Swiss-Prot record:
Cofactor(s) essential for the protein: Mg(2+); K(+)
Keywords from the named record: ATP-binding, Cytoplasm, Magnesium, Metal-binding, Nucleotide-binding, One-carbon metabolism, Potassium, Transferase
Protein name: S-adenosylmethionine synthase
Binding site for K(+): E42
Gene name, Swiss-Prot/TrEMBL: metK
Length: 386
């Protein structure tokens, strides 16, 4: 039975993503100066006000002034450097409330002479891979990200004038009964713009310089529908139009809804939080399975208890596409990979200040970024199972 599946992405100027980028920028700054730091940073944006709050335990002297300066650079990077869109890095108001991590949490997480490092919280995490693309991502989320990347590019490079930083995309893909993508059935693309720019010019520019530059021709048909700025006007955008908050784009950050999600956000969290580190590891493992050719798709779930090092469960599902059983794959993972938090952190190099590059256009599938969890360097372990 064929079906249509849709996924969305948002631009780097979307208020929720600006919040995420500020949080990850502060996290990277702290980790650069103290790789053992504990961070759980949240950011909220409302109109022209920026709130930065949460918990940080570090030997680095992190002042409010340093945090605000980091936030200003992050906001500028996201495109808010012009007062014509009301919200901008220089004129925004900043409020900071950062305090230390709870001693009760540290008691269960920190490594001591008598206890190994435990998980920073309980929770379930999913990783996923599918052979739709060379990035091993489902095609709808991959194309949605490509649209928002291109949208930012044409604005920043001046290819299209009169655009604002805020924007969103959505792509619908028709799949056949074997879960193979056939064609794109619908594209939604919304971009903030200056008041002087007409809807007709926005539509023409988006078709020519974004959509037709990104969507492969063989996926477009005469029946493909296009919805470009469908409300007719998108001048008020960013935090002025909608408040922004860290952790509100979980599905954009992962697999566009094609796989399940455990509910934990990524941005602002150091790797002792398994919401982030275990999700990255689960993605890495799913990629090895699919990249080895023993399955066309793979979903992996990990679950942890706070303060406990070993995962309480490991679940593998290849949805009937694998050449060996799910149980054999799970046993192979348990045999060859250490899934304790400290081991994951060391294996993936997650004490390094690498996180702000993950914030925009998804945390997965960025082959050009050389992120450790995107490498296909252990596929031989699974190739040997066949």
């Amino acid at each position: 039975m064929s079906y249509i599946f849709s996924s969305e992405s948002v631009s780097k100027g979307h208020p929720d993503k600006v919040a995420d980028f500020i949080a990850d920028s502060v996290l990277d700054l702290v980790l650069k100066n103290d790789p053992k730091a504990r961070c759980a940073i949240e950011v909220a944006l409302a109109h022209t006000t920026v709130y930065i709050f949460g918990e940080v335990s570090t030997s680095y002297i992190l002042t409010d002034e340093i945090i605000i300066e980091t936030a200003k650079k992050a906001i500028d990077f996201c495109g808010y450097n012009d007062e014509k869109f009301i919200f901008d890095a220089k004129s925004a108001t900043y409020h900071v409330n950062i305090h230390k991590q709870s001693a009760d949490i540290a008691l269960g997480v920190d490594e001591t002479d008598n206890k190994e490092q435990g998980a920073g919280d309980q929770g379930i995490m999913f990783g996923y891979a599918k052979d739709d693309t060379k990035e091993l991502l489902p095609l709808p989320i991959f194309l949605a990200h490509e649209l928002t990347k291109r949208l930012a590019f044409v604005r920043e490079e001046g290819i299209v004038s009169g655009l604002g930083p805020d924007g969103k995309s959505q792509v619908s893909v028709l799949y056949n009964e074997n879960h193979e993508p056939l064609e794109v059935t619908a594209i939604v693309l919304s971009t903030q713009h200056e008041a002087s720019k007409t809807l007709e010019s926005v539509k023409a520019d988006m078709m020519k310089h974004v959509i037709l530059e990104v969507i492969p021709k063989h996926l477009i048909t005469d029946n493909t529908k296009y919805y470009i700025n469908p409300t007719g006007r998108f001048v008020i955008g960013g935090p002025v139009g909608d408040s922004g908050l860290t952790g509100r784009k979980l599905i954009v950050d992962t697999y566009g809804g094609y796989s399940r999600h455990g509910g934990g956000a990524f941005s602002g969290k150091d790797a002792s939080k398994v919401d982030r580190s275990a999700s990255y590891m689960a993605r890495y493992l799913a990629k090895q399975v699919v990249g080895s050719g023993i399955a066309k798709t793979c979903e992996i779930q990990l679950a942890y208890a706070i303060g406990v090092a070993e995962p309480v469960s490991l679940y593998v599902n290849t949805f009937g596409t694998s050449k060996v059983s799910n149980e054999v794959i799970a046993e192979t993972i348990s045999k060859h990979f250490d899934l304790r938090p400290k081991a994951i952190i060391n294996y993936l190099g997650l004490t390094n200040p690498i996180f702000k590059q993950t914030t925009h256009n998804g945390h997965f599938g960025k082959l050009e970024s050389n992120l450790s969890w995107e490498k296909l360097d252990k596929i031989e372990i699974f190739e040997q199972l066949v």
